[in-house]
Amino acid sequence: MPENFLPALDAAALPPGKGETIEIAGQRIAVFNVGGEFYALHDACPHRGGPLGSGWVEGEKCTVACPLHGWEFDIKTGACISMPGRPVRAYPVRLVEGKVWVSVQQSAASGQ
């Protein structure tokens, strides 16, 4: 596995169209399965801290809506669709031998 990636969960444990909140290296991370592709975001909505891993996933749009007030985020990038300029961090994800790995060391968008 590439450096800085940590095991998150078994891919089979997260069905398509669902999200789950996990803790990696002391951080709450929302992991999503969208049509067999896995993504990870910082779990807290910037509005009121709602758990995005418990939000409503729209697979066709690749978005998640916060379960508290419905703010919508792009699952791939973390961009906030409802309130531009209020993104959440997106993390790089790898799928290796049926396991989802997440790097909390760098951002998916910047690679840093």
What are these regions (language model features)?
Residues A13-S107, G111:
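Rieske [2Fe-2S] iron-sulfur-binding domain
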Residues M1-P2, S110:
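Basic/polar N-terminal segments that are highly enriched at the extreme N-terminus
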Residues E3-A11:
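Short amphipathic
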Residues P2-N4, P87-V88:
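Short coil-to-beta-strand transition motifs
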